[in-house]
């Protein structure tokens, strides 16, 4: 067998997170388990083919919509409201090119940390929107996937591993092979900076 990034470092990290790949591809809320024991670090593995998204979409909107409904009673009362929140998040992502990465990250972080609200309450009162449940972590959906492709115009990039929480890609991992001395962690860091930060929101 030829050793490469996919079957050494990438597979090791994936298996550490999810306890190994199985035929089971359902990824509901809560930590992954097998026979009532935590699987790896509790992440569910889904192949990038099994994620309901197009390459030009940064978010896995079906998963995000389900999470918004599950975590927010005001959205559960009217599930169409989830689309209003997704629209706001999409606008931040699409604004990266004009507003800059730092400003977009700050705006998205405000949503992630529960600092944003929408007029979904009684008489149009603003209620805080939860994208992640920090109080009950079992309410969140944790997915690790490999070869997550994102296309921005003519540019297509593929990350080795991506960690998604509630349909949002929050961690990008660029694995480098331990068997090629010419590749190091610095190469991975430069690739993330040069390829992803400059070209992909």
Predicted regions and their residues:
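An alpha-helical interface "stripe"
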Residues: 1-201
